[in-house]
């Protein structure tokens, strides 16, 4: 049965497995960005209460000149940097590891400190100290202030829109010594104010009918096309128009979605469907 999940800043929908009683395979080593990793990272970012992000926030891109020989060495550098940031007063952090075309990793992160002092140099100096063995230099580091709600959404728009096929997350750009084992590719630390997800069941007049789910998908697509058209971005518009396109009828019924849609718009979708006679219930 299709299930829709609504977050503070987006939502997803899909067909849940009919039977999930099978014995699950134990989780193995992380091998780069996967659809699941992208989905979990996006779900977290969609849930953040941006109005409660207290403290002084910074968006950072931290790089190295030379690729660490192993993923373990990269994780060691990242953890050492985080430890220095905690001692400096860090209250929360979100980070992702991505790769340049030349196969060298870099770190994108959003970090907050208690108080109101925005100290980019503190973060950069700590990175240069822990990553000196990989040729980290001052010119390769970038930082800017996360100025309230607008600054947070600017960070999210960049790092939540990338899928597993983006060149900075593509497995083809993994360093040779990292293939088969990369370690975690995203993470968070400290206190993050988040909203609970809301699960919604939509049905039509038939018993356990899926018509409500299909109607909701069409509303999401229509909103996405309208939003892309108003932005003037031709690439976004082409992508939005291709949403749900599939020549295989049986497969098209199972196509899911995960889109950044304002909460009030998603609730308006539900009200629209309820007014049209669909059953709308929350779990």
From Swiss-Prot:
Keywords: DNA replication, Plasmid. GO terms for biological process: DNA replication. InterPro entries: ORF2/G2P_dom. This is Putative replication protein XF_b0001. It comes from Xylella fastidiosa (strain 9a5c).
